[in-house]
Amino acid sequence: MAEITASLVKELREKTGAGMMDCKKALGETAGDVEAAIDWLRKKGLAAAAKKAGRVAAEGLVGIAAAGTKGVAVEVNAETDFVARNDQFQGFVASVAAVALDKGADVEAIKAAACPGTDKNVADQLTHLIATIGENMSLRRAVRLEVSAGVVASYVHTAIAPGLGKIGCLVALESTGNVDRLNEVGKQIAMHVAAANPLFLDPSVVDTSALDRERNVLTEQAQASGKPAAVIEKMVEGRIRKYYEEVCLSEQVFVIDQENKISKVLENLGKEIGAPVKLAGFARFALGEGIEKEVSDFAAEVAAQAGTRPAG
C-alpha cells in the first residue's frame, strides 16, 4: 500500500475541494491512488463542494452564544434562506458559536478546531455540509466580547431557534453588581442595539475621519446660512452632539423607555445595584451585511446558454 503523504493529500484537496480528513480517508480506501480517490469522493458526494465554492452565499444564520462574562457572535452564510431552516445547518452554526466561545474569534482558529459531535474539524464539517446540502457555505466572521467582572448579555432578533437568527447582538457590561439585574438590563440594551444599529460605543472611539467628514459637511451647511462665525461654530457643535446621539450607543435614547440615554440608564442601574456599571463593548451582526448579492437575469442566462441574445 502506498504511503499517504501530505503532498498526496494536498493534491487531492486541490483537485476536489474536499476536506483534509475526507481526502486522507479516500486515499486510504484507494491505496494512495489519486484518481481512484477522486472517484471515491465523487461517489460519496464530497468532491462536489469545490464546484459550489464560487457561488455567492449571502443567506444563512447568525449564531450567538453567551456564558457569564463572555459571549460570541458568528455568521455562517449559505446561498438560500431555505438552508437556514435545515436542522443540520442550524446545528452546525450552533456548534461554531460554541467553538468560538471556547477558542476565540479568529476564523482560521475556529476552522481548525474540532467540531462538536463529529469526527471532523469545523472546516471539514463545513465541506461535508456543502456536499450534503448542495449549496456553497462559508464561515464569514466571528466576534467575542469578554469582561473581567459583570456580564455579556445577548439578543437574537426573530430567532428561528435558540441563539440563531438573522440579527444577533452582544452587550458587555462591566460591574461587580447583581448579575441577574445586569443580565436583564444588558439584554434590553442588546435589543436596543438590534433596533438602533449604533456605529460606535461612545464619543471617545468615534472614527476621526468620520467625525472630520461630518464636521466639514455641517460647517458648509451652516455657512450657507450667512450667520457670523461664532454662531456657525455653535451650530456645528450642536449638530456634532446630535451626530453623537445618532451613532454612539452611550448617547442614544434607550428604545425601551424613549426617555433616557443609554449612559443614564447604566448610571441609574449602578445606583440601584450599588456598584458602577461600565458599558465595555457591543457587537451587532446582521446577516449578509456588506455582501453583494447576485441579481439573476433569467432571460440573459438562458440566452447565454443557448448562444443567442435576449430579445428586447
From Swiss-Prot:
Chief localisation class: cytoplasm
Pfam families: EF_TS (PF00889)
GO cellular component: cytoplasm
Keyword check for Protein biosynthesis: yes
Ranges for region Involved in Mg(2+) ion dislocation from EF-Tu: 80-83
One of the record's GO molecular function terms: translation elongation factor activity
Keywords assigned: Cytoplasm, Elongation factor, Protein biosynthesis
Places the protein is found: Cytoplasm
CDD domains, A to Z: UBA_EF-Ts (cd14275)
PROSITE patterns linked: EF_TS_1, EF_TS_2
InterPro entries xrefs: EF-Ts_dimer_sf, Transl_elong_EFTs/EF1B, Transl_elong_EFTs/EF1B_dimer, Transl_elong_Ts_CS, UBA-like_sf
PANTHER family per record: ELONGATION FACTOR TS (PTHR11741), ELONGATION FACTOR TS, MITOCHONDRIAL (PTHR11741:SF0)
Role noted for this protein: Associates with the EF-Tu.GDP complex and induces the exchange of GDP to GTP. It remains bound to the aminoacyl-tRNA.EF-Tu.GTP complex up to the GTP hydrolysis stage on the ribosome.
Family membership: Belongs to the EF-Ts family.
Protein name: Elongation factor Ts
Organism from which the protein derives: Paramagnetospirillum magneticum (strain ATCC 700264 / AMB-1) (Magnetospirillum magneticum)
